[in-house]
Amino acid sequence: NAIRKRLSAVKGGRFAQWCAPAHVEAVVLSDILGDPLDMIASGPAAPDHTTCVQAVEIAKKYSLQLSETAWELLNRETPKQLTNVSTQIIGSVRELCLAAAQAARELGYEPVMLTDHLDCQAKEAGRFLGNIVRTHAADGKKLAFIAGGETVVRVVGNGLGGRNQELALSASECISGIANACVLSIGSDGTDGPTDAAGGYVDGDTVRELAENNLTVSGVLARNDAYHALKAVNGLIITGPTGTNVNDVAIALVG
């Protein structure tokens, strides 16, 4: 971002700078956890917190082959203060989680907001949600545990999948055999990894259904092949592109 902002005429607060003294009303759709205005779309209407020194150091560290003009631009500072901008965030992962909570209420579930800053390994998040389900399966309540954010996957195999599919599949062992529970995880943009799926869905029967297809959760995860495994048990969620992106949401239902 530090480099990108300096090679652009509008990023890093320069759009708002060009507009001055006119007032800018920035309406922001955030796809970054924590909603840092200077990073969302590289902050065209936000003061830039990076410096020329950082940009040059990054370029040198990675031995970037840049033109003389580009090097000159890296040494031009971006706006650090903007007095002509008002900003309103109209969509974010927090709003996504709140919408999921409202939908859960309408379906008769009591929503439990776990976090809107989920940023761990997908497998860890899946097991975490699955264990929460197992803990509350006998409570006699209809609960919806909601977590928003964006997990990561450590790719070691040559399979096909995405972080949301891997999260869901990782939860399946924890909820195996529980009749009144499920876990789903989806990307708000309708895509998950290099696949046509938005995410995945598992329930108490998923592990058994995988076994009937000669598949195990551990084996599938070792190959990073959640897509084909979930496809075999009708666990893919396919929405098509939604035209927006406010990160991911994972939901565990019990009761």
Language model features by range: what are they?
Residues A122-I132, V153-L167, G193-Y201:
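Short glycine/threonine-rich loop-to-helix capping motif typified by GTGT followed
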Residues L169-G255:
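Internal helix-turn-beta structural module
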Residues S8-A9, A16-A22, D31-L33, D38-I40, ...:
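Solvent-exposed alpha-helices and their adjacent loops that cap or buttress functional pockets
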Residues N1-S63, G235:
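A glycine/threonine-rich phosphate-anchoring loop and its flanking beta-alpha core
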Residues P47-F128, I132, A137:
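Accessory alpha-helical/coil subdomains and C-terminal extensions
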Residues A2-L7, I32, T151-V153, G187-D192, ...:
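Acidic, glycine-rich active-site loops and adjacent beta-strand->loop/helix elements
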Residues D48-S63, G157-V183:
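Gly/Ser/Thr-rich active-site loops/lids in small-molecule metabolic enzymes
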